[in-house]
């Protein structure tokens, strides 16, 4: 099995594509589109288009190299029972739930399964063989089969893309760290919820304490046929 060398911060990371997964976190209309939840809650989504294109590029490279592709969709049932009631901290901290309480006309529209907000953006489409998982909280490891599905495939290295870097991406990468997964985030294939310093703080946390940081060009270079041929 071939291993590739990915240039990253704070140091390069070596992994076998067949034992690695590209994780696409919450690339839904809610997080990346005008009129979606983040936009309606007052977060800037005006610069997500390049992120979408970079994720498309990363997905294509990962698929060609034989990596597993995992797509997450964050949200709940249309009655929001899965979101938790007042006894859950999620009820009090979820900006989607708070926005709907402020604007009752949005109830049943934000992050509700089956709705436009919940759907992946049109530019990104899972293919047969990809893993598509719903998740009810920020971390993709919480109340999902992600861990068991990865272990069944002998996957130990996770490459992260998606929105939001400082919330669901970082939360999932951190939980993976605690479960002994090696996590690397492609910084130009992610976008923060909040001001730019939130992106920089999340990337600092990841490269300093929990994982590695790279970018889409370096990722594609590492997975290119020429690179794979050199190490075959």
Curated annotation (Swiss-Prot):
Pfam families: Isochorismatase. Keywords: Hydrolase. One of its GO terms (molecular function) is hydrolase activity, acting on carbon-nitrogen (but not peptide) bonds, in linear amides. The keyword Ribosomal protein does not apply. InterPro entries: Isochorismatase-like_dom, Isochorismatase-like_hydrls, Isochorismatase-like_sf, RutB. HAMAP family: RutB. Belongs to the isochorismatase family. RutB subfamily. This is Ureidoacrylate amidohydrolase RutB. It comes from Cronobacter turicensis (strain DSM 18703 / CCUG 55852 / LMG 23827 / z3032).
